[in-house]
């Protein structure tokens, strides 16, 4: 069975809520009250993508299963920097999150992200989006 932190993905539906940065504890608590199972941190959409800032934002979700996503513009996201910088960020945050989402078409980083996640026994959501 796959786990996102302590949350077992047992085949029952789960609710993932996307977040950008700048959330206060009350908004996170409200999402939990409304049934959120997983917080998807859309790091590509953060106003500040500095690693230290991202790690501080992750800390706000302590005790909540976290799926980290960093999509490039070609993947429908907002990451403005290089794939090398994106890979470095994934590697820096992997120990602090419960799972990562990487686009299948991210050929320059996908295998590296998957390998880094596997080394830490973290699940990977390997996404595919067709924008044609």
Q: Which residues fall in each region the model found?
A:
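N-terminal amphipathic alpha-helix/helix-capping segment at the start of soluble metabolic enzymes
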Residues: 1-26
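Short, well-ordered coil/turn segments that N-cap beta-strands
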Residues: 11-15, 35-37, 62-66, 96-98, ...
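Catalytic beta/alpha-barrel core
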Residues: 18-20, 38-48, 69, 86, ...
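Short, acidic/polar
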Residues: 19-33, 81-92
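Extreme N-terminal leader/targeting regions
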Residues: 21-25, 29-61
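Short amphipathic alpha-helical segments and helix-helix/interface helices
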Residues: 29, 55-58, 90-91, 110-115
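Alpha-helix-loop-beta-strand connector modules within alpha/beta enzyme cores
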Residues: 50-74, 115-126
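Structural motif corresponding to the early beta-alpha repeats
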Residues: 65-91
